[in-house]
Amino acid sequence: MKLLVVYDVSDDSKRNKLANNLKKLGLERIQRSAFEGDIDSQRVKDLVRVVKLIVDTNTDIVHIIPLGIRDWERRIVIGREGLEEWLV
């Protein structure tokens, strides 16, 4: 399943922990607070469980958006400059 995960997490430590877990689950960072990837249904369940453990639902928000492959292929990407600056 193709997923887009977008988040706004206020705490630096939690935000870094979330990003590291998204990478471990096989997602790729495409923006500072956005990841995408193809993962199976079990990993989606793992993703939801991990997100619930990390974020504070009173102050943070995470969108997990399933995408059809045709939608993803029709995406428009403008620019790439500066991406490597914050990818560590």
From Swiss-Prot:
SUPFAM superfamilies: TTP0101/SSO1404-like. Its cofactor is Mg(2+). GO terms for biological process: defense response to virus; maintenance of CRISPR repeat elements. Pfam families: CRISPR_Cas2. The gene is cas22. Its EC number is 3.1.-.-. Belongs to the CRISPR-associated endoribonuclease Cas2 protein family. This is CRISPR-associated endoribonuclease Cas2 2. HAMAP family: Cas2 (MF_01471). It comes from Saccharolobus solfataricus (strain ATCC 35092 / DSM 1617 / JCM 11322 / P2) (Sulfolobus solfataricus). Mg(2+) binds at residue 8. CRISPR (clustered regularly interspaced short palindromic repeat), is an adaptive immune system that provides protection against mobile genetic elements (viruses, transposable elements and conjugative plasmids). CRISPR clusters contain sequences complementary to antecedent mobile elements and target invading nucleic acids. CRISPR clusters are transcribed and processed into CRISPR RNA (crRNA). Functions as a ssRNA-specific endoribonuclease. Involved in the integration of spacer DNA into the CRISPR cassette. CDD domains: Cas2_I_II_III.
